[in-house]
């Protein structure tokens, strides 16, 4: 923790094609070893596949997918009197988006399709239709929070 107060958040620039900061953040999540060009190519090709398969604007499909992935509640471990409790807490909007993007990319990477473009496109389409591994992760997170509702009074 810095002594001079909170560290200022570094803002990302909107991407050149869709003019969206969310897309830039997704590119940053996809990026491996600093290869931004490769990450951009993967994302833009995935968006083209989404456009072909759904017939809708890829940004709308992506926004819907992200809405379906972002968690509202999560559990946080809290130590009380020698035992750990999983305390349900509300997820802040910034973290909600971050978790949604992280889960989308991670579960796209685990899929079986041949190229990352196909994996990402299919995961976005699945998430937009309330299916897929990323949506399941959100459901599991919510179930954990629901199951531990009894410990909600330990919140801090």
From Swiss-Prot:
GO CC terms of this entry: small ribosomal subunit
GO molecular function term, any single one: rRNA binding
Alphabetized SUPFAM superfamilies for the sequence: Ribosomal protein S7
Gene3D superfamilies named in the record: Ribosomal protein S7 domain (1.10.455.10)
Alphabetical list of Pfam families matching this protein: Ribosomal_S7
InterPro entries: Ribosomal_uS7, Ribosomal_uS7_bac/org-type, Ribosomal_uS7_CS, Ribosomal_uS7_dom, Ribosomal_uS7_dom_sf
A GO BP annotation: translation
Domain of life: Bacteria
Keyword Ribonucleoprotein: yes
Function: One of the primary rRNA binding proteins, it binds directly to 16S rRNA where it nucleates assembly of the head domain of the 30S subunit. Is located at the subunit interface close to the decoding center, probably blocks exit of the E-site tRNA.
Family from the record: Belongs to the universal ribosomal protein uS7 family.
Oligomer and partners: Part of the 30S ribosomal subunit. Contacts proteins S9 and S11.
Database matches in PANTHER family: RIBOSOMAL PROTEIN S7 (PTHR11205)
Protein known as: Small ribosomal subunit protein uS7
Source species: Shouchella clausii (strain KSM-K16) (Alkalihalobacillus clausii)
Gene name for this UniProt entry: rpsG
């Amino acid at each position: 923790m810095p002594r001079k107060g909170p560290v200022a958040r570094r803002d990302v620039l909107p991407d050149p094609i869709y003019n969206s900061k969310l897309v830039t953040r997704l590119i940053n999540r996809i990026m491996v070893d600093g290869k931004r060009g490769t990450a951009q190519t993967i994302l833009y090709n995935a968006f083209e596949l989404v456009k072909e398969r759904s017939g809708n604007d890829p940004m709308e499909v992506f926004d819907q997918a992200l809405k379906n992935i972002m968690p509202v509640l999560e559990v946080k471990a809290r130590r009380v009197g020698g035992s750990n409790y999983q305390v349900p807490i509300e997820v802040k909007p910034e973290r909600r988006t971050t978790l949604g993007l992280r889960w989308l990319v991670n579960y796209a990477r685990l899929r079986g399709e041949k190229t990352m473009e196909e994996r990402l496109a299919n995961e976005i389409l699945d998430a937009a239709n309330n299916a897929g591994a990323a949506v399941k992760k959100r459901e599991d997170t919510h179930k954990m929070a629901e199951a531990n509702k009894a410990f909600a009074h330990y919140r801090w």
